[in-house]
Amino acid sequence: MKNWKFNKINYPTFEKSGAIPRSITKTFEKLKKELNPHSESEIIEEFTISRYQTIASLRYLIVLVVFPVVVHQVSKNFIIGPAVDYFWKYNQIDVFLNSSQEERAFAELQRFEEKIHFEMLIGTKQSVSQQSLEASIKQKAVEIADHYTYESLHAIKNILADSISISVFILLIVLGKRQTFVLKSFLNEIVYGLSDTAKAFLIILFTDMFIGFHSPHGWEVVIESLLRHFGLPENRDFIFLFIATFPVSLDTVFKYWIFRYLNQVSPSAVATYHNMNE
């Protein structure tokens, strides 16, 4: 199987439309194949190649997903984690990595103090001395400091571990060019082998989810989570600028893909998409 030529692998993705309709061309190809005296052996060979393509693609896809995740968890928990904890402990680094953490910590401590005063005023909490009140606030401040110390450590570990796992993923892609080619052909065959209605449904689902009317709220949550994941300041100007530009760029690329590729490969799917989107 390793000696098979790649031109035997099916890739119906980029068939260009010509003067003769594709349906007529496929009908003649089917008739020619049925009249071929060696058609039975060719069908068996095509089935064998298709089976090899499916097994190889699924195996490589599992490797691409599982191996970087395993490397990420192992490196983070057994190599990067202990090293970062040791460095942080013996260098007495500040609790906060950015101003956003400080603002959240101060707001949380302020809410705690205001809650105590409010409960004392309405009588749900017994009045305590100023010394006891300061002790409670101090204890809460220590808890908040421990929480944000853990968050800062976690962010540094995420940056290093994610960098390693991304490097491993890129290395797998670079070293597995043959497997990548087979996987790409396999995925193209699945996507472009869907019915026109299924294609149109997936297109509408994708566009409404990522570039639709409600997508800015989702993008805001995603960007804030990513910034917090890497310990970066949650700059509102950057978030709003990203939301204002990236979905528009994504929409432009998507429309170009429909015009440039999908319109040639499956014009009926494009027509179905426009009808469903109206």
Swiss-Prot record:
Annotated function: Contributes to K(+)/H(+) antiport activity by supporting proton efflux to control proton extrusion and homeostasis in chloroplasts in a light-dependent manner to modulate photosynthesis. Prevents excessive induction of non-photochemical quenching (NPQ) under continuous-light conditions. Indirectly promotes efficient inorganic carbon uptake into chloroplasts.
Keyword Transcription regulation: no
Organism from which the protein derives: Cyanidium caldarium
Domain of life: Eukaryota
Bilayer-spanning residue ranges: 61-81, 155-175, 203-223, 238-258
Recorded topology in the membrane: Multi-pass membrane protein
Gene Ontology CC: chloroplast inner membrane
Keywords of the record: Antiport, Chloroplast, Hydrogen ion transport, Ion transport, Membrane, Plastid, Plastid inner membrane, Potassium, Potassium transport, Transmembrane, Transmembrane helix, Transport
Reactions catalysed: K(+)(in) + H(+)(out) = K(+)(out) + H(+)(in)
Record localization: Plastid, Chloroplast inner membrane
Keyword Transport: yes
Protein name according to UniProt: Potassium/proton antiporter CemA
Pfam families according to UniProt: CemA
Main location: plastid
Family: Belongs to the CemA family.
GO terms classed as biological process: potassium ion transport
Gene Ontology molecular function: any one: proton transmembrane transporter activity
